[in-house]
Amino acid sequence: MLKALQKRIIFQPTRLPDDYVFRFDQPFEEFFLTDLSSGLRINALFFPAGWGSGRQLVLYFHGNAGNLQRWGKLSADFTQHGYDFLVIDYPGYGKSPGQPTEEGCYHSAQMAYNWALERYTSERIIIYGRSLGSAMASWLAAHRPARQLILETPFPSMTKLIAYKVPRFIANLGAPVHFPVEHFLQRVPYPKSVFQGTHDWIVPYKAALELKPWVGDDRFFVIEGGGHKNLNQFDYYHEKLIQVLEK
Protein backbone atom coordinates (compact mmCIF):
# COMPACT_ATOMS: atom_id res chain seq x y z
CA MET A 1 0.00 0.00 0.00
CA LEU A 2 2.82 2.39 0.88
CA LYS A 3 4.62 1.70 -2.38
CA ALA A 4 1.39 2.26 -4.30
CA LEU A 5 1.08 5.65 -2.60
CA GLN A 6 4.71 6.46 -3.42
CA LYS A 7 4.07 5.61 -7.06
CA ARG A 8 1.11 8.00 -7.19
CA ILE A 9 3.36 10.72 -5.79
CA ILE A 10 6.17 10.00 -8.25
CA PHE A 11 3.90 9.88 -11.31
CA GLN A 12 1.36 12.72 -11.44
CA PRO A 13 0.01 12.69 -15.00
CA THR A 14 -2.80 14.86 -16.29
CA ARG A 15 -4.70 13.03 -18.99
CA LEU A 16 -6.17 14.67 -22.07
CA PRO A 17 -9.06 13.58 -24.30
CA ASP A 18 -8.08 12.20 -27.69
CA ASP A 19 -9.65 15.18 -29.45
CA TYR A 20 -7.81 17.79 -27.37
CA VAL A 21 -6.33 20.53 -29.55
CA PHE A 22 -2.92 21.86 -28.49
CA ARG A 23 -2.32 25.60 -28.84
CA PHE A 24 1.05 27.33 -28.78
CA ASP A 25 2.46 30.65 -29.94
CA GLN A 26 4.80 29.06 -32.48
CA PRO A 27 4.50 26.46 -35.24
CA PHE A 28 4.47 22.82 -34.13
CA GLU A 29 3.54 19.35 -35.27
CA GLU A 30 1.69 16.76 -33.18
CA PHE A 31 2.02 13.04 -33.86
CA PHE A 32 2.15 9.63 -32.19
CA LEU A 33 5.07 7.23 -31.96
CA THR A 34 4.12 3.55 -31.94
CA ASP A 35 6.19 0.48 -31.18
CA LEU A 36 4.52 -2.44 -32.94
CA SER A 37 6.33 -5.09 -30.92
CA SER A 38 5.15 -3.82 -27.53
CA GLY A 39 2.08 -1.87 -28.57
CA LEU A 40 3.37 1.21 -26.75
CA ARG A 41 1.98 4.44 -28.21
CA ILE A 42 3.12 7.87 -27.09
CA ASN A 43 2.08 11.39 -28.00
CA ALA A 44 4.78 13.80 -29.22
CA LEU A 45 5.17 17.45 -30.18
CA PHE A 46 7.83 18.79 -32.53
CA PHE A 47 8.71 22.49 -32.69
CA PRO A 48 11.00 23.47 -35.60
CA ALA A 49 13.33 26.39 -35.08
CA GLY A 50 12.43 27.55 -38.56
CA TRP A 51 15.78 28.94 -39.62
CA GLY A 52 19.44 28.02 -40.05
CA SER A 53 21.12 25.17 -41.86
CA GLY A 54 22.27 21.95 -40.23
CA ARG A 55 19.96 22.47 -37.29
CA GLN A 56 20.28 20.49 -34.08
CA LEU A 57 17.54 18.88 -32.01
CA VAL A 58 16.87 19.16 -28.30
CA LEU A 59 15.26 15.88 -27.26
CA TYR A 60 13.41 16.91 -24.10
CA PHE A 61 12.14 14.65 -21.30
CA HIS A 62 9.81 16.44 -18.92
CA GLY A 63 9.06 16.18 -15.21
CA ASN A 64 6.61 14.01 -13.31
CA ALA A 65 3.46 16.13 -13.62
CA GLY A 66 1.18 17.60 -16.27
CA ASN A 67 1.29 16.87 -19.98
CA LEU A 68 2.48 18.29 -23.29
CA GLN A 69 0.26 21.36 -23.11
CA ARG A 70 2.38 22.53 -20.19
CA TRP A 71 5.76 21.29 -21.33
CA GLY A 72 5.48 22.34 -24.95
CA LYS A 73 5.62 25.96 -23.84
CA LEU A 74 9.29 25.50 -22.93
CA SER A 75 10.15 24.99 -26.60
CA ALA A 76 10.74 28.72 -27.04
CA ASP A 77 13.75 28.56 -24.69
CA PHE A 78 15.47 26.53 -27.40
CA THR A 79 13.87 27.39 -30.75
CA GLN A 80 14.70 31.08 -30.29
CA HIS A 81 18.35 30.06 -30.45
CA GLY A 82 17.92 27.91 -33.55
CA TYR A 83 17.43 24.49 -31.95
CA ASP A 84 14.55 22.22 -32.95
CA PHE A 85 12.62 20.79 -30.00
CA LEU A 86 10.94 17.41 -29.49
CA VAL A 87 9.03 16.50 -26.33
CA ILE A 88 6.97 13.40 -25.54
CA ASP A 89 4.36 12.38 -23.00
CA TYR A 90 5.14 9.17 -21.11
CA PRO A 91 2.53 6.38 -20.93
CA GLY A 92 -0.50 7.59 -18.99
CA TYR A 93 0.31 11.27 -19.56
CA GLY A 94 -1.82 13.49 -21.79
CA LYS A 95 -3.00 11.53 -24.81
CA SER A 96 -0.52 8.69 -24.33
CA PRO A 97 -2.49 5.58 -23.30
CA GLY A 98 -1.47 3.15 -20.58
CA GLN A 99 -0.01 3.58 -17.12
CA PRO A 100 3.37 5.13 -16.26
CA THR A 101 6.09 2.69 -15.22
CA GLU A 102 9.85 2.97 -15.01
CA GLU A 103 10.42 0.59 -17.91
CA GLY A 104 7.68 2.25 -19.94
CA CYS A 105 9.36 5.62 -19.52
CA TYR A 106 12.71 4.23 -20.68
CA HIS A 107 11.03 2.57 -23.66
CA SER A 108 9.36 5.88 -24.55
CA ALA A 109 12.73 7.62 -24.47
CA GLN A 110 14.14 5.06 -26.89
CA MET A 111 11.17 5.54 -29.23
CA ALA A 112 11.72 9.29 -29.26
CA TYR A 113 15.42 8.80 -29.95
CA ASN A 114 14.64 6.46 -32.85
CA TRP A 115 12.44 9.15 -34.39
CA ALA A 116 15.18 11.73 -33.93
CA LEU A 117 17.89 9.52 -35.39
CA GLU A 118 15.90 9.14 -38.61
CA ARG A 119 16.15 12.92 -39.09
CA TYR A 120 19.37 14.01 -37.36
CA THR A 121 22.79 12.49 -36.94
CA SER A 122 23.64 11.58 -33.35
CA GLU A 123 26.12 14.50 -33.27
CA ARG A 124 23.17 16.86 -33.74
CA ILE A 125 21.00 15.43 -30.97
CA ILE A 126 21.11 17.04 -27.52
CA ILE A 127 19.43 15.00 -24.78
CA TYR A 128 17.77 17.14 -22.10
CA GLY A 129 16.05 15.90 -18.95
CA ARG A 130 14.20 17.87 -16.31
CA SER A 131 13.48 16.52 -12.82
CA LEU A 132 12.00 13.03 -13.30
CA GLY A 133 12.94 13.35 -16.96
CA SER A 134 16.59 13.39 -15.91
CA ALA A 135 16.25 9.63 -15.38
CA MET A 136 14.98 8.99 -18.90
CA ALA A 137 17.57 11.37 -20.35
CA SER A 138 20.52 9.86 -18.48
CA TRP A 139 19.34 6.30 -19.23
CA LEU A 140 19.16 7.14 -22.92
CA ALA A 141 22.53 8.89 -22.89
CA ALA A 142 24.12 5.86 -21.23
CA HIS A 143 22.90 3.64 -24.06
CA ARG A 144 22.88 5.83 -27.18
CA PRO A 145 25.25 8.37 -28.76
CA ALA A 146 24.44 12.08 -28.80
CA ARG A 147 26.22 15.42 -28.81
CA GLN A 148 25.70 16.03 -25.10
CA LEU A 149 23.44 15.50 -22.09
CA ILE A 150 21.86 18.33 -20.08
CA LEU A 151 19.99 17.77 -16.81
CA GLU A 152 17.85 20.30 -14.96
CA THR A 153 17.01 19.77 -11.27
CA PRO A 154 18.10 16.09 -11.34
CA PHE A 155 18.33 13.63 -8.44
CA PRO A 156 20.89 10.85 -7.80
CA SER A 157 18.25 8.10 -7.60
CA MET A 158 14.64 7.85 -6.50
CA THR A 159 15.70 5.83 -3.45
CA LYS A 160 18.12 8.55 -2.36
CA LEU A 161 15.63 11.32 -3.10
CA ILE A 162 13.03 9.65 -0.88
CA ALA A 163 15.65 9.37 1.87
CA TYR A 164 16.13 13.14 1.70
CA LYS A 165 12.39 13.76 1.97
CA VAL A 166 10.94 11.30 4.50
CA PRO A 167 11.89 9.67 7.82
CA ARG A 168 14.58 7.00 7.55
CA PHE A 169 12.32 4.09 8.55
CA ILE A 170 10.06 4.88 5.59
CA ALA A 171 12.94 5.42 3.21
CA ASN A 172 14.38 2.04 4.17
CA LEU A 173 11.27 0.40 2.77
CA GLY A 174 12.56 1.33 -0.66
CA ALA A 175 11.04 3.01 -3.68
CA PRO A 176 8.57 1.42 -6.13
CA VAL A 177 10.81 2.69 -8.93
CA HIS A 178 14.56 3.18 -8.97
CA PHE A 179 15.55 5.69 -11.66
CA PRO A 180 19.29 5.46 -10.78
CA VAL A 181 20.48 8.65 -12.46
CA GLU A 182 23.93 8.56 -10.85
CA HIS A 183 24.49 5.03 -12.16
CA PHE A 184 23.57 6.06 -15.70
CA LEU A 185 25.69 9.22 -15.58
CA GLN A 186 28.82 7.19 -14.92
CA ARG A 187 28.27 5.43 -18.24
CA VAL A 188 27.72 8.52 -20.41
CA PRO A 189 30.88 9.01 -22.53
CA TYR A 190 30.16 12.52 -23.80
CA PRO A 191 29.75 15.97 -22.15
CA LYS A 192 27.23 16.26 -19.31
CA SER A 193 25.84 19.40 -17.65
CA VAL A 194 23.59 20.04 -14.64
CA PHE A 195 21.48 23.07 -13.72
CA GLN A 196 20.33 23.16 -10.09
CA GLY A 197 18.79 25.80 -7.84
CA THR A 198 19.77 26.39 -4.23
CA HIS A 199 16.15 26.77 -3.08
CA ASP A 200 14.71 23.62 -4.64
CA TRP A 201 12.26 22.06 -2.17
CA ILE A 202 11.51 19.01 -4.32
CA VAL A 203 15.06 17.96 -5.18
CA PRO A 204 17.23 19.40 -2.39
CA TYR A 205 20.43 21.06 -3.52
CA LYS A 206 22.45 18.51 -1.52
CA ALA A 207 20.81 15.68 -3.43
CA ALA A 208 21.68 17.12 -6.83
CA LEU A 209 25.20 17.86 -5.58
CA GLU A 210 25.83 14.11 -5.40
CA LEU A 211 25.95 14.12 -9.20
CA LYS A 212 28.73 16.69 -9.41
CA PRO A 213 31.60 14.14 -9.49
CA TRP A 214 30.13 12.64 -12.67
CA VAL A 215 29.63 16.03 -14.34
CA GLY A 216 32.58 18.16 -13.30
CA ASP A 217 32.86 21.54 -11.61
CA ASP A 218 32.79 23.51 -14.85
CA ARG A 219 29.50 21.96 -15.98
CA PHE A 220 27.59 21.97 -12.69
CA PHE A 221 25.71 25.28 -12.77
CA VAL A 222 24.21 26.57 -9.52
CA ILE A 223 21.30 29.00 -9.76
CA GLU A 224 21.34 31.03 -6.54
CA GLY A 225 17.78 31.34 -5.24
CA GLY A 226 16.47 29.04 -7.94
CA GLY A 227 13.66 26.61 -7.13
CA HIS A 228 12.45 23.46 -8.78
CA LYS A 229 10.15 25.00 -11.36
CA ASN A 230 11.58 28.44 -12.13
CA LEU A 231 15.18 28.15 -13.30
CA ASN A 232 14.29 29.55 -16.73
CA GLN A 233 13.24 32.77 -15.01
CA PHE A 234 16.88 33.49 -14.16
CA ASP A 235 19.19 35.25 -16.61
CA TYR A 236 22.10 33.12 -15.41
CA TYR A 237 20.30 29.97 -16.56
CA HIS A 238 19.81 31.32 -20.08
CA GLU A 239 23.36 32.65 -20.24
CA LYS A 240 24.89 29.31 -19.32
CA LEU A 241 22.38 27.31 -21.35
CA ILE A 242 23.41 29.11 -24.52
CA GLN A 243 27.07 28.52 -23.70
CA VAL A 244 26.46 24.81 -23.13
CA LEU A 245 24.37 24.38 -26.27
CA GLU A 246 27.04 26.03 -28.40
CA LYS A 247 29.96 24.02 -27.02
Task: Walk through the language-model features, giving the residues of each.
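Catalytic active-site module of serine/aspartate enzymes centered on a nucleophile-bearing elbow/loop
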Residues: 235-247
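An N-terminal hydrophobic leader/cap segment in hydrolases
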Residues: 1-34
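Short beta-strand/loop motif that positions the catalytic acidic residue
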Residues: 187-189, 194-196, 200
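Membrane-embedded segments
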Residues: 37-115
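Catalytic histidine-centered segment of alpha/beta-hydrolase-like enzymes
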Residues: 226-236
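Primarily recognizes the serine-hydrolase "nucleophile elbow" in alpha/beta-hydrolase
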Residues: 115-118, 122-166
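Conserved alpha/beta-hydrolase "acid-adjacent" motif
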Residues: 201-207
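Mobile cap/lid helix-loop segments that gate and shape the active-site cleft of serine hydrolases
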Residues: 154-184, 190
